[in-house]
């Protein structure tokens, strides 16, 4: 399965347009909060994920659904219009990537780097603080960290900052060992 949080070219363009509008209208933090909230809703709801991903729903149905979600959640008007536009243009599948791109643009605008941390089990507050400190010292910037649990990595940690991936997972170490043994 493709990584739906990776920004496509279309998602990047939508994110850039929204970013410019939020700067012009002085709504950057509010719209960013809305989009982060929507991202959490999509992660938590299989029905919402299905609405975005399934070709069985028309662009019009997706637009109506996203607009209803935005209204129910109390999103900014700009956010609601953006969601409706993306869906009605048949780009609902690019929405999560657009959100990721927007959040990265916003963080860059604030002078903060975004880092996605993937672990096999949830991190404690102390562990998260340690990761944050390590990322900050490595990059020289304050990190904004989002965490995700992926049991398939077996153990260790993966940290993605922009296009760079620091992979210290047990899965990758085992894969490397397997490859080395096959070559021997």
Curated annotation (Swiss-Prot):
F(1)F(0) ATP synthase produces ATP from ADP in the presence of a proton or sodium gradient. F-type ATPases consist of two structural domains, F(1) containing the extramembraneous catalytic core and F(0) containing the membrane proton channel, linked together by a central stalk and a peripheral stalk. During catalysis, ATP synthesis in the catalytic domain of F(1) is coupled via a rotary mechanism of the central stalk subunits to proton translocation. This protein is part of the stalk that links CF(0) to CF(1). It either transmits conformational changes from CF(0) to CF(1) or is implicated in proton conduction. Signal peptide: none annotated. Its main location: membrane. Keywords: ATP synthesis, Cell inner membrane, Cell membrane, CF(1), Hydrogen ion transport, Ion transport, Membrane, Transport. It comes from Caulobacter sp. (strain K31). It comes from the Bacteria. This is ATP synthase subunit delta. Belongs to the ATPase delta chain family. Disulfide bonds: none annotated. PANTHER family: ATP SYNTHASE DELTA CHAIN (PTHR11910). NCBIfam families: ATP_synt_delta, PRK05758.3-2. It is found in: Cell inner membrane.
